[in-house]
Regions:
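Extracellular glycan-associated modules
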Residues: 160, 184, 227-315
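A generic fold-level signal
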Residues: 28, 77, 86, 130, ...
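Trp- and S/T/G-rich repeat-edge/linker motifs of beta-rich repeat architectures
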Residues: 1-32, 38, 42, 48-73, ...
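Glycine-rich, histidine-containing beta strand-loop boundary motifs that form or position
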Residues: 47, 86, 129, 170, ...
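Short aromatic-centered micro-motifs
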Residues: 6, 37, 255, 259
């Protein structure tokens, strides 16, 4: 275990093993990959049972970036910085440099012994914890705000923002909760009902092709949810200026990039979705965070453009 692989066509190619057999401070071999994250064009990873942050250098080579003194649970990016969550109460931020002297402790969360998961929601970093399955939100003044507990669960596992809403998986019942605001979480269902086990996990999560996905343990199944309708572009935009168009027609949502269709929702009956509301229209700021880039020549139409009209607009 502990290997990382990349997909080339229809075959998997080894990218080596994080940390080799044993790090200088590791009590066990690095035999399990716990999390991977891309930061500033480089791939970083952490192991499950040992300390240390590792950076991929190409081929089968990994650099051991060191340890701040405790095991890490996961890592993620927010506002241009890499963050790691520890087997403890801390959240750490890394901005530059080659060693752990550049890491800044951002939090010591009360009553928390593991900071397990991370997401970006409404412009803030949010983290999930053990042993009370609470979610905390980072505020601009540096404070951490308790967003409530997920039922009677013990740990918040995978978290994702899907169709403008924050979802989180749990342990020990393998449930998925939806955040409804003001500290209130609603259980959307139990994904793992394996009998005669102590812990069931809704562990990993992703948004793909307009749906929310969760992986479960010990059942080993992948479950999906479609709430409302959405169309998602599941790859990064190419560098430079891109022409984007989002169109809602009578029964379909369509996303275009440079005049070409790149995503479509499943079909729906328009009458089932009354979107009238009193909320302000926000451009360049969504349910994740602010857009990092530049926007020009914004146009809003009163009707749905046809595909040929989008192509003409894209030039």
């Amino acid at each position: 275990g502990g290997g990382v692989f990349r997909l080339e066509g229809d075959r998997w190619v080894s990218c080596g093993k994080m940390g080799g057999e044993r790090g200088a401070y590791a009590e066990y071999c690095h035999d399990t990959v716990h999390a991977l994250e891309v930061f500033q064009g480089r791939l970083y990873g952490v192991a499950l049972y040992t300390q240390g942050l590792f950076r991929y250098e190409g081929g089968c080579d990994w650099t051991d970036c060191g340890s701040h003194g405790s095991r890490l649970m996961t890592l993620g990016t927010f506002r241009g910085d890499l963050h790691v969550l520890e087997n403890g109460s801390g959240v750490y931020r890394f901005s530059s440099g080659e060693d752990w002297t550049k890491w800044t402790r951002m939090a010591a969360l009360p009553g928390v012994t593991q900071v397990y998961s991370m997401a970006v929601y409404e412009g803030s970093m949010v983290v999930g914890t053990w042993p009370e399955a609470r979610v905390f939100r980072w505020a601009a003044n540096g404070e951490w705000i308790d967003m409530g507990r997920l039922g009677e669960e013990l740990e918040v596992m995978g978290m994702a923002v899907y169709n403008s809403t924050l979802y989180a998986g749990t342990l020990p019942l393998g449930q998925v909760y939806r955040y409804d605001g003001n500290g209130h979480w609603t259980c959307t269902g139990q994904l793992d009902t394996t009998p005669d086990v102590k812990f069931r996990r809704a562990w990993s999560t992703a948004v793909y092709d307009g749906k929310l996905y969760f992986g479960t343990l010990p059942a080993g199944r992948v479950m999906s949810l479609e709430a409302g309708r959405s169309a998602t572009l599941d790859s990064a935009l190419a560098p430079g200026w891109r022409h984007l168009a989002a169109v809602r027609s009578a029964g379909m949502l369509t996303v275009y990039v440079d005049g070409e269709t790149v995503a479509e929702s499943s079909e729906f009956a328009a009458a089932d979705y009354d979107l009238r509301n009193s909320q302000p229209l926000r451009i360049g700021c969504g349910q994740h965070d602010y857009f990092t880039g530049r926007i020009a020549d914004l146009q809003i139409y009163r009707g749905a453009l046809r595909a040929d009209e989008v192509r003409e607009s894209a030039g």
